[in-house]
Amino acid sequence: MIASNEYVIGVDYGSDSVRTIVADAHNGNEIASSVYYYPRWKEQLYCNAAINQFRQHPLDYVEGLEETIKQCLTQAGAAVAANIKAISVDTTGSTPVAVDKTGSPLALLPGFENNPNAMFVLWKDHTSVEEAAEINAHAGKFDTNYLQFVGGIYSSEWFWAKLLHVLRKDEQVRGSIYSFVEHCDWIPFLLTGGNDVAQMKRGVCAAGHKILWAKEWGGLPPNEWFASLDPLLDGFTSRLFKETYTSDQAAGTISKEWASRLGLPETVVIGVGAMDAHMGAVGGQIEPYYLSKVMGTSTCDMLVAPADEVEGKLVAGICGQVNGSIIPGMIGMEAGQSAFGDAYAWFKKVLTWPLQNILSKSSIVSLDVVKQLVEETADKIIPELSRQAEQLSIEDVGELAVDWFNGRRTPDANQLMTGAVIGMDLGTDAPKIFRAIVEATCFGAKAIVERFVEQGIPVKGLIGMGGVARKSPFIMQMMADVMNMPIRIHKSEQTCALGAAMFAATAAGIFNKVEDAMNAMGQGFDAEYHPNPEKVSFYRKRYEQYKQLGKFIEQHTNGGKKDEVLEPEQLAMDSEQLVMAVNSEK
């Protein structure tokens, strides 16, 4: 029996905030929790949505780390604080930053404080689309396919594309950068008091899925592969890493400085970091061949399989398959959608535009009342749209959408792809458009399952986690109907932070392996959605229409090549054929 006076801390860095929990290592019960919204990010400093630039200042992360842990320890009390055994961290990814030789992000150094290129390049930053395209073209020139374990396509959301973009665009950063570091590797390094980036323990999770590390070729691709891509990368691999570590291992122990700042014992173990969805899958009690879907602003879909059962199988077009990236000893496979909750948030933003831009100038209503009206309306829009969309008869459905509002992550990454809604007429209203967007996100999820199955990886069921999964029965029921399989919703509202806590307990030696931590600390499931047999065939036909529309978009945006001119006559002819094909299925 594990002593009940052992506690661990799980820290979950999301896109907008950092969430920290203190959990009982015996049963996973949440003792305390705290959320910190990044103040600079909230003001959208250093970001430019028009060019898909999204950067985050390291101070948002550092301040959030200290604030949330201190708040948790205040809630939990001195007795709990004295018995904290370990801390583990998950973050978004790929979210890398330029650092100096000591491992300090350049944005923390004089002269770089307000330079976006010296900050963390958030996962959804798509400024490096051209660099990603160059990497993909370059990879085809070599006998060894160094992209084979990342689905065969390198994304603009990932490490090397972002590094190359920063090096090309910023002479100041280029002259001061020593290495490039993922967020999930930097926080443990910070907590352990690291001052030499060469000693930083890099997690296999980010290394395998985003940085092209693989044991099959002895680590990273050879220097000549990168040097021939661009001379700016010549020699860079020597300043990165050769070894990687799974997240059940310790990165070290907390430094005296951080122990003092946080009020923790100097014996606290710091675990090796990983990306949020991977630790979230563990927090959500993932099982072999069950697709674990972390559904928030985007989705990250995780699947684990015993290494001996999938040996030799490479799944094309996903975000990678890496031994030990989720559960040590199993192949962790990652896929996902670039916009899920963000697609709904975009439509909400469109609908609230008049309130934000016209009502605020009203001479009839005070600014305080306007602010209250905007906040109240914004809070109610998605729930009300969901309620009315749910009441729509499927016989009346005409609108059809594609969910690539932030590009396409999986299958077959292409961040230049765009969303679309067709089939609208003068009877189309907001609930109908919203329903089409929700349906499209569910179809995008189905495309991922279809890809796994086509490539010989069975999907036995679905596990739902995250804000959308817990807050929207309408979306989850449609997901079950579209997928034609049940989806279980995990009870924990903080599966990523809980997963981090499970890894912390394992790194501290409280458990021998993370599966034991899952069994002891897992909170179970509190909802399950089953497909409605009356709607399954309807959605099967609609899904074929979705694929036709997606194919049309891909063909007629020239695969995202905006410098090519479309032939109007051919476009009109193909558009007419698309509409006829869609209408014929009604």
Residue ranges and their predicted role:
Residues 13-15, 137, 142-274, 358, ...:
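Gly/Ser/Thr-rich active-site cleft segment
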Residues 1-108, 235-238, 260, 264-269, ...:
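N-terminal glycine/serine-rich phosphate-binding loop of ATP-dependent small-molecule kinases
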Residues 133, 275, 279-283, 341, ...:
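Glycine-rich phosphate-binding/hydrolytic loop that grips phosphoryl groups
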Residues 19-21, 192-197, 365, 369-419:
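Conserved ATP-utilizing enzyme core subdomain
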Residues 58, 78-158:
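Active-site phosphate-binding/coordination module
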Residues 158, 212-328, 338-339, 351, ...:
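ATP-dependent carbohydrate kinase catalytic cores
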Residues 157, 335, 343-345, 350-372, ...:
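Acidic, glycine/GT-rich loop-and beta-edge segments that sit at the periphery of enzyme/chaperone cores
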Residues 390-489:
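Activation-segment/catalytic-loop signature of the eukaryotic protein kinase fold
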